[in-house]
């Protein structure tokens, strides 16, 4: 039976490139002269350190722009709360979302089942597998999910006949 997987993955190398480009732009921008603003990435967490809330907002806007240029959807970024840091600075942790959480997977399965398509959707860890008897049914399911606006971007891979 034909099947495909619904995943939500981001290329961390592209995220790293976007972070490096953001750091480079911050060091050369005139409005950041004398600023101690920094950006660091460890695994799936980007830490933004800035002088004040305004500069923090500027850094996040630059980061989002660089993400878009690197073909990384900004919806992958989960911005945490702004917290005070040492030396009258502010810090914000940005988590890069990887995989589909169980609540979001249930929402995807429910959307497919409510559409009354001739496919079955099953949650498998951090992905959703959709199987059907015909390839056309699977393509209808992909079209349905692309037409929906979810809070997290989806990719469709592992399409098998």
Swiss-Prot record:
Any GO molecular function: nucleotide binding
Superkingdom per UniProt: Bacteria
Coiled coil: none
Gene Ontology CC: cytosol
Cross-referenced Pfam families: DUF520
UniProt keyword Nucleotide-binding, yes or no: yes
Keyword annotations of the record: Nucleotide-binding
Manganese is among the record's keywords: no
InterPro entries: DUF520, UPF0234-like_C, UPF0234_N, YajQ-like_sf
Protein family membership: Belongs to the YajQ family.
Record-linked HAMAP family: YajQ
Function: Nucleotide-binding protein.
Identification of the protein by name: Nucleotide-binding protein Mmc1_1670
Species assigned in the record: Magnetococcus marinus (strain ATCC BAA-1437 / JCM 17883 / MC-1)
Native organism taxonomy: Bacteria, Pseudomonadati, Pseudomonadota, Alphaproteobacteria, Magnetococcales
